[in-house]
A protein has these predicted regions:
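Fe(II)/2-oxoglutarate oxygenase catalytic core
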Residues: 1-139
Length: 139
């Protein structure tokens, strides 16, 4: 198998988003309609439910919002600093996930080739809660 990247497969930004900003992002995202998460598909029609694999509630963050722009800027920064230098032409709508007691998202790889999302090259995870307040979330 030919190696595509000579750089790391992940990028971890040690600098944290300030706690106050995290709290504001949570408040903004809780205003969006929350729904039970599926494991694949960009819309309700394509959503597959598999509660042995993923159990959480999510909201879609609309494009053009302050939160989406903040995430997009972090993706661009990681793309440059990790020296991936992908040409990012578009981003899927980001998800805000709320994990309550008993909720989880098991280990997985985003490897499905989906003709509807040929631009999908990078993923971002931002933990907004204090790590002392939950178990898991490791990448």
């Amino acid at each position: 198998m030919r190696q595509v990247l000579n750089t790391p497969y992940w990028y971890n930004k040690e600098e944290r988003i300030p706690k106050k900003l995290c709290e504001e992002i949570i408040e903004i995202c809780k205003e969006y309609e929350m729904d039970e998460a599926g494991v694949f598909g960009a819309n309700e029609k394509d959503k597959l439910m598999n509660t042995s694999y993923r159990q959480t509630n999510i909201a879609w963050i609309p494009k053009g919002t302050v939160v989406e722009k903040l995430l997009h800027s972090h993706v661009g920064l990681a793309n440059m600093q990790a020296a991936w230098n992908f040409t990012v032409t578009d981003m899927e709508a980001a998800q805000f996930a709320e994990y309550t007691k008993g909720h989880f998202y098991d280990w997985h790889k985003d490897v499905a080739l989906n003709p509807a999302t040929p631009h999908r090259k990078l993923s971002i995870s931002v933990n907004l809660s204090d790590p002392k307040d939950y178990e898991g979330g490791d990448l």
